[in-house]
């Protein structure tokens, strides 16, 4: 009579994958690796980060992989704001309707707009004026992504057009030094090695970044463009609560740890843990903000 009753193993009993849809090295990757290391140490199963850069597709190819994996807690997505906010609205069948629930948001990026040191402008306003009579190339992480849309919206509100724009897997010191782009939107982490050799024109953050205190936020330049860029952990909506709870408990401890907070201090990022309910509310608020941004771009 009991033969047909499966015995469910306690989670986790096999390796756990944390999928980061970007190349190694940026903040979400570094922090997710900390999460995986601590989860492995706590639970005694292998836990590893797998990087799945999407090229011009940004984080969405990686998100598709998480969406199509079994909803058992063994594949966890480490996703930027764009995946839950717009991923199910941009004609990607595998991501619609919305597939993911947040476990928690843990990172606010020190996102910036940067130019090379020899650029003939020192501010967003000067750059806009220069761009009215000179073609400037914008480098970004993907056309649908929020930093890209903010950069395009700024051009529209400031009365100029980008000469060209292109997506890159990584936007760093080499992107500017090689001349592949005149202006890039990227994270401060990726340009820290050359911070003294470039110009930070604005930050796409809610407050000024401590490492660049003289640089205004884009919201200071134009209040309509005030938005925060974050990263969080996500699982498929059908993932069991037991798995969610264990991932959350471990990740929260990691984010509040000394090494995670040191990374925040060193890079200008904000590192914290926002619970699932508050994260879901943040996503709703950001969807409304994206609607307003879309109206600016029409």
Region locations from a protein language model:
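C-terminal segment of classical bacterial N-terminal signal peptides
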Residues: 1-8
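Hinge/capping helix and adjacent helix->loop/strand transition within the periplasmic-binding protein
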Residues: 41, 65-74, 87-171, 228-263
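Hydrophobic/aromatic beta-strand patches that form the interior of the parallel beta-sheet core
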Residues: 19, 103-104, 113, 166, ...
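N-terminal (or domain-start) structured segment
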Residues: 8-98, 134-135, 143-147, 155-185, ...
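An extracytoplasmic/periplasmic, membrane-proximal ligand-sensing/linker region
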Residues: 13-16, 157-160, 241-298
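C-terminal lobe and pocket-closing loops
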Residues: 108, 186-256, 285-288
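Short coil/turn segments
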Residues: 23-25, 81, 116-121, 140-145, ...
């Amino acid at each position: 009579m009991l033969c047909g009753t499966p015995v469910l193993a306690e989670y986790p009993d096999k390796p756990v994958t944390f999928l980061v849809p970007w190349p190694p090295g940026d903040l979400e990757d570094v922090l997710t690796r900390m999460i995986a290391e601590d989860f492995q140490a706590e639970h005694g199963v292998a836990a590893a980060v797998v990087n799945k850069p999407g090229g011009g597709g940004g984080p969405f190819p990686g998100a598709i992989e998480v969406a199509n994996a079994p909803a058992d807690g063994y594949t966890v997505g480490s996703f930027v704001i764009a995946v839950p906010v717009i991923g199910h609205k941009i004609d990607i069948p595998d991501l619609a309707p919305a597939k993911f629930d947040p476990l928690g948001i843990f990172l606010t990026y020190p996102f910036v707009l940067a130019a090379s040191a020899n650029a003939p402008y020192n501010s967003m306003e000067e750059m806009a004026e220069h761009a009215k009579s000179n073609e400037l190339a914008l480098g970004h992480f993907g056309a649908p992504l929020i930093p890209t849309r903010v950069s395009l919206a700024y051009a529209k509100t400031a009365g100029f057009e980008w000469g060209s724009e292109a997506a890159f897997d990584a936007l760093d010191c080499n992107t500017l030094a090689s001349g592949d782009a005149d202006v890039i939107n990227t994270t401060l982490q990726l340009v820290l090695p050359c911070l003294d050799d470039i110009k930070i024109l604005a930050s796409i953050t809610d407050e000024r970044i401590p490492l660049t205190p003289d640089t205004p936020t884009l919201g200071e330049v134009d209040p309509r463009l005030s938005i925060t860029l974050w990263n969080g952990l996500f699982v498929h909506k059908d993932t069991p609560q037991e798995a969610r709870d264990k991932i959350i408990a471990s990740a929260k401890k990691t984010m509040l740890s000394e090494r995670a907070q040191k990374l925040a201090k060193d890079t200008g990022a904000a590192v914290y843990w926002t619970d699932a309910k508050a994260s879901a509310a943040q996503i709703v608020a950001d969807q409304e903000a994206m609607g307003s941004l879309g109206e600016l771009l029409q």
